[in-house]
Structure formats: C-alpha cells, structure tokens
C-alpha cells in the first residue's frame, strides 16, 4: 500500500559513476529495444578487461537470447538444445542505448541493469561481474552475435 508523500522536498541523487566502458560501436540513432529485437542473439564468448577468454568460467552467460521490442519480452534459451533456460521476463534498453535492464519472472526471479559496451546490428556486448578462470570475482564482458543456427525458439510465456 502506498499513500502520497507530503514531507520535505526530495531530490534525485547523483551518485552513479559515469558509464564509460566501450568495446565497439553503440548505435544511438535507433531504439536499442528494436536492435535487440531484430534477430536471435548467440552468446559467443566472455572476456575479461584485458581481452582474455574466460568463457569456460562463465557458461551461465552463454545462451540464445530472444527479445521482442513490441511486448518487451525476453527469454534465454539453451545454446545446445534450443529449449528455454527458464529465464524470461521483460526488458528495456535505456540511457541512450547504454543500459539494458531486465526483470526475470522465470525460475529464478531477479532484476539486472547491465551496462552495454557495444550495440549494433552485428554485435551486442554488456559488462557485469563474473569469474576469472581461477574462480575469482572480476568484471567480464559478454559478447553476442546474430545466431546462425537452426533453432527458432518461441517464447514460452
């Protein structure tokens, strides 16, 4: 339950650091939702800030990603089987195509706001916390390219 607030005047904080990571071109003259919705995306690899491949330690980020810009639905599918991973919900790209936010209503309910470091028709990449090959927490970059395989998964919700 919510009621109107009539206390002192509130202001937004300015505490967020600038989002400056970039691994490639970020298209800003087209809706990020529409860019993501143009194709099925294949998570191809995960690298650290020095470009070292850490995909093996971050397999949970490798999947097929489907986005619908009209309904704001997203769903992640298993790369080997094309079956749902049970991670689905709603997404939106905001802040001049610099942030992809999504809320999962699937098996694991969670929300994430991830910095996009590349977004165009050929690739999209985001950064988040992941693991190095020794299991330590590090910043990683998850790369995606348009899917070229035979699966045509449909949303399951």
Spans of features found by a protein language model:
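Lipid interaction determinants
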Residues: 1-87, 97-157
């Amino acid at each position: 339950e919510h009621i109107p607030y009539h206390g002192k005047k509130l202001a937004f904080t300015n505490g967020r650091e600038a989002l400056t990571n970039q691994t490639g071109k970020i298209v800003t003259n087209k809706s990020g939702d529409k860019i993501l919705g143009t194709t099925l995306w294949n998570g191809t690899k995960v690298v650290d800030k020095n470009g070292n491949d850490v995909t093996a330690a971050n397999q949970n980020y490798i999947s097929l990603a489907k986005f619908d810009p009209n309904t704001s639905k997203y769903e992640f599918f298993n790369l080997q089987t094309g079956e749902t991973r049970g991670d689905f919900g709603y997404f939106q790209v905001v802040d001049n195509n610099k942030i992809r936010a999504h809320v999962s209503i699937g098996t694991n309910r969670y929300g994430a706001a991830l910095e996009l470091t590349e977004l165009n028709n050929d690739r999209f990449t985001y950064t988040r916390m992941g693991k190095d090959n020794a299991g330590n927490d590090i910043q990683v970059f998850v790369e995606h390219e348009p899917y070229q395989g035979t699966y045509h998964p449909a949303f399951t919700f």
